Swiss-Prot record:
Subunit of heteromeric glycine-gated chloride channels. Plays an important role in the down-regulation of neuronal excitability. Contributes to the generation of inhibitory postsynaptic currents. Channel activity is potentiated by ethanol. Potentiation of channel activity by intoxicating levels of ethanol contribute to the sedative effects of ethanol. It catalyses: chloride(in) = chloride(out). It is a multi-pass membrane protein. It holds the Pfam family Neur_chan_LBD. It comes from Mus musculus. This is Glycine receptor subunit alpha-1. The lineage of its organism: Eukaryota, Metazoa, Chordata, Craniata, Vertebrata. Glycans are attached at residue 66. PROSITE patterns: NEUROTR_ION_CHANNEL. It is linked to Defects in Glra1 are the cause of the spasmodic (spd) phenotype, a mouse mutant which resembles the human neurological disease, hyperekplexia (or startle disease (STHE)). Defects in Glra1 are the cause of the lethal oscillator (spd-ot) phenotype. Mutant mice display a fine motor tremor and muscle spasms that begin at 2 weeks of age and progressively worsen, resulting in death by 3 weeks of age. Heterozygous mice show an increased acoustic startle response. Neurons from homozygous oscillator mice have dramatically reduced amplitude and frequency of glycinergic inhibitory postsynaptic currents. Strychnine binds at residues 230-235. Channel opening is triggered by extracellular glycine. Channel characteristics depend on the subunit composition; heteropentameric channels are activated by lower glycine levels and display faster desensitization. Channel opening is also triggered by taurine and beta-alanine. Inhibited by strychnine. Strychnine binding locks the channel in a closed conformation and prevents channel opening in response to extracellular glycine. Inhibited by picrotoxin. Channel activity is enhanced by 5 uM Zn(2+) and inhibited by 100 uM Zn(2+). Residues 273-277, 331-425 are cytoplasmic. Interacts with GLRB to form heteropentameric channels; this is probably the predominant form in vivo. Heteropentamer composed of four GLRA1 subunits and one GLRB subunit. Heteropentamer composed of two GLRA1 and three GLRB. Heteropentamer composed of three GLRA1 and two GLRB. Homopentamer (in vitro). Both homopentamers and heteropentamers form functional ion channels, but their characteristics are subtly different.
Length: 457
């Protein structure tokens, strides 16, 4: 009986103990704080009750905020010489530390927030100093990213398309190398409050397989600081320089080769008979007009600049060679017809000789109407009115050399035609050689000398 009562006592004591333990655990579970929901956490971090003010920068009245910038280029193109600008699509990423956003209450190491939360935090007032036009992307939603880390680091990424000014030096066009810049600057905060700097690794990244229609984007990126000084203070500024080397394929096909063929075509007139005036004149005028049109077309897509470009020199020299070929035929035609002018001059001269000259000339035997030998004048020269000398008798017995026999009209015609043909023969060699020498100097200067000058800048 005693053992049974003892056993029942111990059993009752055990039940009471476990009941008390269970009740304490339930009470502890009820009294333990519930895990904070994301909404409650954000309200506590940057809501109205948090004391966070997006109008005030981090470290207010303290050291400036350092903002690390990074650019990822999605596309690069639409480089326009007439407006001197270029179009680029980029991801702009900014990172800074805001101690007010550091947290320990939430288990995640970082929070990716909705873009609508951007209005609730402070952001740098970055703008592009050489921007001519820009727009954000909102398809299918705002292309923006906001990420907050446990230590208060903030990552702000945004996708934008920019049209940026790019002053170009077209002296070497179309063998030029252009440098286009992108300047990132603070609009309102001076360097006492905000400093921009490039990210140490991969500050400027380019999408794989990115190609440009007319340019080669060189791999080296020139990153610089461009601090601006205004009346309102000194403002932070950073810039990236993109070196673009123009490809000549399009211009060789559209400008250089056609103009070269037109110049060669103008040389065909040197092998055409000089008597075929319609053919040679028609060919010369056609090549001149074609070359003029080609020269005008080469300037259609370029701005009206005050200096001379490489393409202008090429077109001007080609036009000069074509026009010179036309003038060459004018010279050939003029020389070949000179014998007619000479014969006409001779006939005119004989027609205007004084009739008195016949009184002083001997008739085959020296017995003319007046025989000056009888008067002792000898072979002296009497000067007629038109300058014709007549032999007299008192010239100290000296005689003038007999006049050279004049050439016949046919001989004169052949002489001048040979001279004209000689001009054509010289032109057949002279024009190509002169154009070849010009090409040697042209390509050496623009492809080697000036290119080295550009790279050394």
């Amino acid at each position: 009986m005693y053992s049974f009562n003892t056993l029942r006592f111990y059993l009752w004591e055990t039940i009471v103990f476990f009941s008390l333990a269970a009740s304490k655990e339930a009470e502890a579970a009820r009294s333990a704080p519930k895990p904070m929901s994301p909404s409650d956490f954000l309200d506590k971090l940057m809501g109205r009750t948090s004391g966070y003010d997006a109008r005030i920068r981090p470290n207010f009245k303290g050291p400036p905020v350092n903002v690390s910038c990074n650019i990822f280029i999605n596309s690069f193109g639409s480089i326009a010489e007439t407006t001197m600008d270029y179009r680029v699509n980029i991801f702009l990423r900014q990172q800074w530390n805001d101690p007010r956003l550091a947290y320990n209450e939430y288990p995640d190491d970082s929070l990716d927030l909705d873009p609508s939360m951007l209005d609730s935090i402070w952001k740098p007032d970055l703008f592009f100093a050489n921007e001519k036009g820009a727009h954000f992307h909102e398809i299918t939603t705002d292309n923006k990213l906001l990420r907050i880390s446990r230590n208060g680091n903030v990552l702000y990424s945004i996708r934008i398309t920019l049209t940026l000014a790019c002053p170009m030096d077209l002296k070497n066009f179309p063998m030029d190398v252009q440098t286009c810049i992108m300047q990132l600057e603070s609009f309102g905060y001076t360097m006492n409050d905000l400093i921009f700097e490039w990210q140490e690794q991969g500050a400027v990244q380019v999408a794989d397989g990115l190609t440009l229609p007319q340019f080669i984007l060189k791999e080296e990126k020139d990153l610089r600081y461009c601090t601006k000084h205004y009346n309102t203070g000194k403002f932070t500024c950073i810039e990236a320089r993109f070196h673009l080397e123009r490809q000549m394929g399009y211009y060789l096909i559209q400008m250089y080769i056609p103009s070269l063929l037109i110049v060669i075509l103008s040389w065909i007139s040197f092998w055409i008979n000089m008597d075929a005036a319609p053919a040679r004149v028609g060919l010369g005028i056609t090549t001149v007009l074609t070359m003029t049109t080609q020269s005008s077309g080469s300037r259609a897509s370029l701005p009206k600049v005050s200096y001379v470009k490489a393409i202008d020199i090429w077109m001007a020299v080609c036009l000069l060679f074509v026009f010179s070929a036309l003038l060459e035929y004018a010279a050939v035609n003029f020389v070949s017809r000179q014998h007619k002018e000479l014969l006409r001059f001779r006939r005119k001269r004989r027609h205007h000789k004084s009739p008195m000259l016949n009184l002083f000339q001997d008739d085959e035997g020296g017995e003319g109407r007046f025989n000056f030998s009888a008067y002792g004048m000898g072979p002296a020269c009497l000067q007629a009115k038109d300058g014709i000398s007549v032999k007299g008798a008192n010239n100290n017995n000296t005689t003038n050399p007999p006049p050279a026999p004049s050439k016949s009209p046919e001989e004169m015609r052949k002489l001048f035609i040979q001279r004209a043909k000689k001009i054509d023969k010289i032109s057949r060699i002279g024009f190509p050689m002169a154009f070849l020498i010009f090409n040697m100097f042209y390509w050496i200067i623009y492809k080697i000398v000036r290119r080295e000058d550009v790279h050394n800048k």
